[in-house]
Structures are given as C-alpha cells and as structure tokens.
Regions:
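Short, low-structural-confidence N-terminal segments
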Residues: 1-74, 160-186
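Basic side chains
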Residues: 4-5, 76, 86, 138, ...
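Proteins with a high burden of low-complexity, intrinsically disordered sequence enriched in S/T/G/P/A and R
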Residues: 8, 115-119, 123, 150, ...
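Hydrophobic membrane-targeting alpha-helices
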Residues: 18-22, 92, 142
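A ubiquitous, low-specificity "background" feature that marks scattered single residues
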Residues: 20-21, 110, 132-137
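N-terminal targeting/tethering segments
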Residues: 27-130
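Acidic/polar surface patches and capping/hinge elements
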Residues: 121-125, 130, 137-181
Length: 186
C-alpha cells in the first residue's frame, strides 16, 4: 500500500514537473527567450530569423558576427526585439478583431515574387514580415477609420499620428519579459 502511494505521488510530481517545463517553453531543446503579454517566444522561433540574416549577409558579401561573440548577441537581441514587435502586432490585431490568414500571406508573398504559385514558403522570416505588414495595414484601417480632414495631406498626417499613438500605447501597455542575456540593448 505504501509502495503504491509512493508510486502515485512520484507520477503526480513527475507530471507536474513536465507540465511546468512545457508551459515555460518546451524544455531545454526549445527554451523561452522572451514573453510578450504572457505569450512565449522560443529559441526555435528566433533561430530561423538569425539564420535569415546570416544568409543575407553572406549573399551580400558582408560579415556576420560569430556565434557566442558580443556582436552576435547584440544582433540576435535586436532580431528578438523584431519578433517581440510582431507578437505585439498580432495581439493588438486580435484585440481589434482583425487578422491576416495564411492564404492572404501566401498570396502577398507570391504577388511580390518571393514565392512561386504552389511553392512552399521556405523562409519563416519573409512569411512573418508579410503577416506583420498585413496586420499593420488592418490595424491602421481600424484605428484611423473615423478620422476626417480638409485635405488629403492633412488626412494622411492625422492618420499617421493616430496610428503612431496607438502603436506607442500598445508597446507601453504590453508586458514584455526577456530571459537573462536576451534583452535588447541601447
């Protein structure tokens, strides 16, 4: 009887530890590097973005910092900040009731020449960039829908100010927590 209780207790504790690891970001092979409003950004999300820029630098004949160097950490952390911004956009869009579907993102990519019809999107950075652009367009339309002005130039200026104020508020009000060693610097 005591052995059975001990086994049950061990299973319960083990399940709790496993659940805790999964909720924190997937364990050691995919640690959480930041949280945006409670939503994790993981190492497996950050790595392809870093790889994208590493390949871009190579294609342009420019150096890319070596892994582990201080310069690499600065670049990596700036790229993480980009993922944080995109996550803030997705969360803000959801609160406003706007979205960008996978089909819309792929169509925009195909229209830009980044992907051929029927071709799989291989670069998650490009996909995320197009998704963010579509969301920003829809957020802008929603936030600026009631703005009026006597001229087109003044209308554009008023809309730009309203969108800037909205995005600044989103950034200010969204709680972002970076894991040690990942916070973007000045």
């Amino acid at each position: 009887m005591i052995l059975r209780r001990g086994l049950v207790l061990a299973l319960v504790v083990g399940a709790a530890v496993l659940a805790s690891v999964l909720l924190r970001g997937g364990g050691h092979d995919n640690p959480t590097v930041a949280r945006v409003g409670g939503e994790p950004i993981t190492q497996k999300q950050l790595d392809p973005v870093v790889d994208h820029f590493r390949l871009e630098a190579k294609a342009e004949g420019k150096p890319f910092p070596d892994n582990g160097s201080a310069a690499f950490r600065r670049v990596r952390n700036r790229l993480l900040d980009l993922l944080v911004y995109r996550t803030e956009l997705r969360q803000a869009a959801a609160r406003l009731g706007v979205k960008a579907t996978e089909v819309e993102v792929v169509r925009r990519l195909q229209g830009s020449g980044s992907a051929e019809p029927g071709e799989a999107i291989r670069d998650s950075f490009e996909y995320g960039s197009v998704e963010a652009q579509l969301l920003l367009e829809r957020i802008s339309a929603k936030v600026t829908s009631g703005i009026k002005a006597p001229t087109r130039a003044e209308l554009a200026a008023r809309r730009n100010r309203a969108l800037s104020r909205y995005l600044a508020r989103v950034e200010r009000e969204t709680q972002v927590r970076y894991e040690p060693g990942y916070a973007p610097g000045p």
